[in-house]
Amino acid sequence: LLSAEGMDQLLCAIRARVNLEPDAEITMEANPGSVEAEKFAGFAKAGINRVSLGIQSFQDAQLKALGRIHNGEEAKHAIAIALQHFKSVNLDLMFGLPNQSLEAARSDMEIALSFKTPHLSFYNLTLEPNTYFASFPPKLPSEDEIDAIFEQNLKLLEAAGYRRYEVSAYAKKDQECKHNLNYWRFGDYIGIGAGAHGKISFPDKITRQVRERHPETYMQAMETKGNALIEAREISAKDLPFEFMLNTLRLTDGVDTVTFEERTGLPLNVVSKGLDEASKKGLLDPNPNKLKATEQGLRYLNNLQELFL
């Protein structure tokens, strides 16, 4: 992890080049190991005002199964220190973990809620291709068990004053994550640094960009060419509707229908077939001025999004 001094230099360099808003959200992601937690005071002094902690679970056996280097007590320690130094703190929790019981999932959520952080992300474990779990699948809870875990913990979140504003994101009033809202509204963002991705809209096209992934290669490219791009792909008109829906349908409030044309440059009728089918299946809200998933649509989000392929 970058040192506090390095973070200070980085943010000073950004401020010297970009006119940041006074209330700009400046987020850092961190693992809850004790060494990193002790650095939080320095990061806050450098200008970080929001930290996202990859807790995943407070159960030592679950953390070990996930290959995490921290344990439950270190996670609690990191949260306590983060709350002392940062305006906003997010906790990442996972469910549907190997051999996870309803009781263990409830315990994880109750511990997380006891810290009263402004924001909480609650993800279902997915087995990504080319990972250890994909090659050697563990025993996971059944679909019914996963549904029970989700419904149980959703009630706990709502009772604690959190609102679900995205399929996996929950926040106290006015504590939604600004940069993630921008992604989910199909907004633009600049990728700076090794491995960074960006999305940029031009008057006649929208491109996705990728930078050199290895830090040393990235720095060499910047020094010799002033540019470390390894890919700048234009999103085709055929793919734009799906990419838009892939992001915006994650939001529980959805977006206004006019946003589709504003962000894609395409008329809404190019997705009329998908909209009709989604409405018939009860996956899309019938409000003609909104593109918004129903509760059923959020539950079967992949099925809803695939209608726009």
Describe the residue ranges of each PLM region:
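A short, conserved structural fragment
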Residues: 279-289
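Generic N-terminal initiation segments characterized by hydrophobic and/or small/turn-forming residues
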Residues: 110, 272, 281, 298-301
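Minor-groove-contacting beta-hairpin "wing" of winged helix-turn-helix DNA-binding domains
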Residues: 290-294
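Short, amphipathic alpha-helical interaction segments positioned at domain boundaries
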Residues: 296-309
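C-terminal scaffold of the Radical SAM
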Residues: 1-266
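Short, ordered coil/turn segments that flank beta-strands lining enzyme active or ligand-binding pockets
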Residues: 185, 280, 295
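Short amphipathic alpha-helical interaction segments
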Residues: 265-277
